């Protein structure tokens, strides 16, 4: 009988982020979509093709009514910042979005607190841009001819 060859386990070094020099910033793009029902915080690479982290306010709280709250957005943003630090991202460009279209163009209550939580957690903020879709000639808004009657 021949002796069985044992394979030595290969040691792989896993680098989550890009290799950078000391003091150099690694940028990601954080897309904050704040509606009045939920707040989405979605981090991609600079091209926007590769999703790195995506967390919503609804993933952080139990009650449905609290999904869009500033508290849920703050918890989600802290989670996102921690995950980004693990991946090696140190700075972010922010793209803030409201519902837009023929609906409301003002961001929901979680937008400001999410942005503040990202900044307070040690992330450097690059550009802040509003990417709410604004129609040039909109479709008709819901509510009918006489509007919503309260």
Curated annotation (Swiss-Prot):
<dbReference type="GO" id="GO:0006412">
    <property type="term" value="P:translation"/>
</dbReference>
<keyword id="KW-0963">Cytoplasm</keyword>
<dbReference type="GO" id="GO:0003729">
    <property type="term" value="F:mRNA binding"/>
</dbReference>
<dbReference type="InterPro" id="IPR036967">
    <property type="entry name" value="Ribosomal_uS11_sf"/>
</dbReference>
<dbReference type="GO" id="GO:0022627">
    <property type="term" value="C:cytosolic small ribosomal subunit"/>
</dbReference>
<protein>
    <recommendedName>
        <fullName>Small ribosomal subunit protein uS11y</fullName>
    </recommendedName>
</protein>
<comment type="similarity">
    <text>Belongs to the universal ribosomal protein uS11 family.</text>
</comment>
<keyword id="KW-0597">Phosphoprotein</keyword>
<keyword id="KW-0687">Ribonucleoprotein</keyword>
<dbReference type="InterPro" id="IPR018102">
    <property type="entry name" value="Ribosomal_uS11_CS"/>
</dbReference>
<dbReference type="GO" id="GO:0022626">
    <property type="term" value="C:cytosolic ribosome"/>
</dbReference>
<dbReference type="InterPro" id="IPR001971">
    <property type="entry name" value="Ribosomal_uS11"/>
</dbReference>
<feature type="modified residue" description="Phosphoserine">
    <location>
        <position position="19"/>
    </location>
</feature>
<dbReference type="GO" id="GO:0003735">
    <property type="term" value="F:structural constituent of ribosome"/>
</dbReference>
<dbReference type="GO" id="GO:0005829">
    <property type="term" value="C:cytosol"/>
</dbReference>
<dbReference type="GO" id="GO:0005730">
    <property type="term" value="C:nucleolus"/>
</dbReference>
<dbReference type="Pfam" id="PF00411">
    <property type="entry name" value="Ribosomal_S11"/>
</dbReference>
<keyword id="KW-0689">Ribosomal protein</keyword>
């Amino acid at each position: 009988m021949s002796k069985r060859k044992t394979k030595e386990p290969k040691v792989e070094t896993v680098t989550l982020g890009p290799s950078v020099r000391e003091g150099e910033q690694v940028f990601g793009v954080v897309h904050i979509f704040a509606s009045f029902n939920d707040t989405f915080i979605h981090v991609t690479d600079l091209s926007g093709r590769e999703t790195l982290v995506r967390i919503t306010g609804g993933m952080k709280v139990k009650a449905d009514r609290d999904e869009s709250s500033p508290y849920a957005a703050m918890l989600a943003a802290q989670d996102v910042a921690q995950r980004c630090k693990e991946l090696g991202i140190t700075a972010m460009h922010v793209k803030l979005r409201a519902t837009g279209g023929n609906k409301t163009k003002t961001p929901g209550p979680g937008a400001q607190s999410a942005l503040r939580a990202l900044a307070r957690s040690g992330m450097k903020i690059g550009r802040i841009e509003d990417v709410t879709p604004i129609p040039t000639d909109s479709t008709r808004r819901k509510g009918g001819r006489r509007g919503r009657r309260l």
